[in-house]
């Protein structure tokens, strides 16, 4: 390869990445997922468009695995362990039982539609059987979904790859050897995938955490150390026949939920790397496909995609979540709809090509077509479905910027900056009147270009910039303190006519609003009553009905209900309440 060829590759690669980034601005305007746009850029630049010929499946496999490892590491870093209390076991059920059911139902339909053997059909089902972490993390971000739904989908997408890889590799081996029966040894292999992946991921994450916190390096080297360590854990786990995808996700989970040096620097770097990984991966996959090869299979492939989306996925979710009573029907319906397919099925579809199986190109084209339909249909309609099924909650107002204050190695102190607009509730209030969360401090107050020296009597004005020192767990309380009037109105429309303290006694609530206890202990706290009625771990947005009124969890403090909204039937709104 001469210098001219190398420079041409650099130029083409840079132009494709830049074009993907620039065109992605159309995503919000058109309501199309950004991943579809990036995929389209690759297809347009490929053999049927710009004429770039790329058919190196081994390179695509390499790029895909590298990109997914980075994306899962970033996803694990941003997943809070606290979300496991409501979603760990449901998500694992979806990641195992759910993938198996989806594989069988989709595979049987594929065998019938394309006149294939049952094993060949099941291979197609296994290839498209798992949801995709890149698609889920990308499309769920900032949608304001309740914690139970978000955590279930994210943990499922981060942990269901071992099952899909296991089924795909097993079925490829059966087709290559002519084997038609299953044996118990396969179950042991599956347990090995999960077991080794979990052990290496958690153990390797702990070792990497100790390295980051104990070694003094230049600030810019810590993110690189984390990425290198995560990739090493991914590769080592794969080398000893564990699930590298699960391991790197758990590694990120350990790092993201313990005090770690240069936390914000690591997160910022990983955010950029995860975006680059997604862009590179979907560009390569777009280049790899030949669009005109999809046309002959378009109608049966569309039928298979719709069968998977409308039948196989909903049935797998219904069975997978059957033991978990805390999930409402609308939450199950939304989880069923957000069975997003992305890069993982396309990468798994490369396996049969590399193994030289008959019909391997058909498997690849089918996987690509199903991913395209999933992203266009499910990804585009995600915000609309969330509102229709009422699984969204009002978001907490966020600061306009935040920065780490690394006063010691594992410092978790941060600086939050809030801009006070005309609609803020605190305008005109003196600083001493603000009920700041315990442990937070106002560090600075800017008015225009001037840094003020505030006292307790200083009043807040429109346009002020308020700098507050605190921790991440203070953000909900600070958000309420510096919220806007429209946001408060949204809170009350969502949570009800009044918002009560969670420790209010039922007897007092019943007397205040004229409700009947019907044998319920009057000394029971309202929060405990909601938990009993809800039959599971509560999250913000959970609702129960009592005495014809709707009671909604409004604020959580860890796993404890702090405030509860109450909505009365139209025209029967009585008495006072305690507002947020």
From Swiss-Prot:
GO cellular component, one term: plasma membrane
GO terms, biological process: cell volume homeostasis
InterPro entries documented for this protein: Cation/H_exchanger_TM, FAD-bd_PCMH-like_sf, FAD-bd_PCMH_sub2, Na+/solute_symporter_sf, NhaP2, RCK_C, RCK_C_sf, Transptr-assoc_dom
Principal localisation: membrane
Localisation: Cell inner membrane
Catalytic activity line of the entry: K(+)(in) + H(+)(out) = K(+)(out) + H(+)(in)
Annotated transmembrane regions: 6-26, 34-54, 57-77, 86-106, 108-128, 162-182, 189-209, 217-237, 240-260, 279-299, 302-322, 334-354, 366-386
Record Pfam families: CorC_HlyC, Na_H_Exchanger, TrkA_C
Keyword DNA repair carried by entry: no
Membrane topology reported for the UniProt record: Multi-pass membrane protein
Listed SUPFAM superfamilies: FAD-binding/transporter-associated domain-like (SSF56176), TrkA C-terminal domain-like (SSF116726)
Annotated RCK C-terminal domain residues: 402-484
GO MF: flavin adenine dinucleotide binding; potassium:proton antiporter activity
Record keywords: Antiport, Cell inner membrane, Cell membrane, Ion transport, Membrane, Potassium, Potassium transport, Transmembrane, Transmembrane helix, Transport
Domain of life: Bacteria
Family listed: Belongs to the monovalent cation:proton antiporter 1 (CPA1) transporter (TC 2.A.36) family. NhaP2 subfamily.
Entries under HAMAP family matching the protein: NhaP2 (MF_01075)
Function of the protein: K(+)/H(+) antiporter that extrudes potassium in exchange for external protons and maintains the internal concentration of potassium under toxic levels.
The protein, known as: K(+)/H(+) antiporter NhaP2
Organism in which the protein naturally occurs: Pseudomonas syringae pv. syringae (strain B728a)
């Amino acid at each position: 390869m001469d210098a001219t060829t190398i420079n041409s590759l650099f130029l083409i690669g840079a132009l494709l990445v830049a074009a993907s980034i620039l065109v992605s601005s159309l995503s919000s305007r058109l309501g199309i997922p950004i991943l579809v746009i990036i995929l389209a850029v690759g297809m347009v630049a490929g053999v049927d468009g710009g004429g770039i010929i790329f058919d190196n499946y081994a390179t695509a496999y390499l790029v895909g695995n590298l990109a997914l490892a980075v994306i899962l590491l970033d996803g694990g870093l941003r997943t809070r362990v606290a979300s496991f209390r409501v979603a760990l076991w449901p998500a694992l059920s979806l990641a195992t039982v759910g993938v198996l059911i989806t594989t069988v139902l989709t595979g049987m339909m594929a065998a019938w539609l394309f006149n294939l053997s049952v094993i060949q059909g099941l291979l197609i089902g296994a290839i498209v059987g798992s949801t995709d972490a890149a698609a889920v993390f990308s499309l769920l971000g900032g949608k304001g979904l309740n914690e139970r739904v978000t955590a279930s989908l994210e943990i499922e997408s981060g942990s269901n790859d071992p099952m899909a890889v296991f089924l795909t590799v097993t079925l490829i081996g059966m087709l290559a050897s002519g084997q038609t029966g299953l044996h118990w040894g396969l179950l042991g292999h599956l347990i090995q995938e999960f077991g080794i992946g979990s052990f290496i991921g958690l153990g390797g994450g702990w070792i990497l955490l100790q390295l980051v916190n104990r070694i003094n390096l230049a600030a810019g080297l810590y993110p690189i150390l984390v990425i290198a360590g995560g990739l090493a854990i991914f590769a080592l786990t794969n080398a000893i026949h564990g699930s590298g995808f699960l391991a790197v996700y758990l590694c990120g989970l350990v790092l993201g939920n313990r005090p770690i040096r240069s936390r914000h620097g690591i997160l910022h770097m990983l955010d950029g790397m995860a975006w680059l990984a997604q862009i590179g991966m979907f560009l390569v996959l777009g280049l790899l496909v030949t669009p005109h090869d999809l046309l002959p299979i378009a109608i049966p492939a569309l039928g298979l995609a719709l069968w998977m989306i409308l039948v196989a996925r909903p049935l797998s979710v219904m069975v997978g979540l059957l033991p978990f009573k805390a999930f409402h029907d609308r939450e199950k319906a939304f989880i069923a709809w957000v069975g997003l397919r992305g890069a993982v099925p396309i990468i798994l579809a490369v396996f049969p090509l590399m193994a030289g199986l008959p019909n391997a190109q058909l498997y690849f084209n089918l996987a690509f077509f199903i991913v395209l339909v999933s992203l266009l249909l499910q990804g585009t309609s995600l915000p609309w479905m969330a509102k229709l099924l009422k699984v969204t909650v009002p978001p907490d107002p966020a600061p306009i910027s935040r920065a780490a204050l690394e006063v010691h190695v594992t410092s978790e102190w941060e600086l939050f900056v809030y801009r006070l607009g005309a609609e803020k509730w605190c305008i005109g209030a003196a600083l001493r009147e603000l009920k700041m969360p315990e442990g937070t401090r106002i560090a600075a107050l800017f008015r225009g270009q001037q840094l003020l020296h505030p006292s307790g009597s200083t009043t807040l004005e429109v346009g002020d910039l308020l700098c507050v020192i605190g921790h991440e767990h203070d953000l909900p309380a600070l958000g309420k303190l510096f919220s806007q009037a429209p946001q408060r109105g949204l809170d009350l429309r969502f949570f009800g006519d009044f918002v009560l303290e969670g420790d209010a006694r039922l007897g007092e609530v019943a007397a205040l609003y004229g409700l009947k206890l019907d044998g319920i202990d009057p000394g029971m706290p309202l929060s405990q009553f909601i938990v009993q009625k809800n039959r599971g771990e509560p999250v913000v947005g959970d609702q129960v009905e009592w005495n014809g009124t709707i009671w909604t969890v409004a604020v959580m403090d860890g796993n404890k209900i702090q405030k509860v909204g109450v909505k009365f039937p139209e025209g029967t709104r009585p008495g006072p309440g305690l507002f947020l």
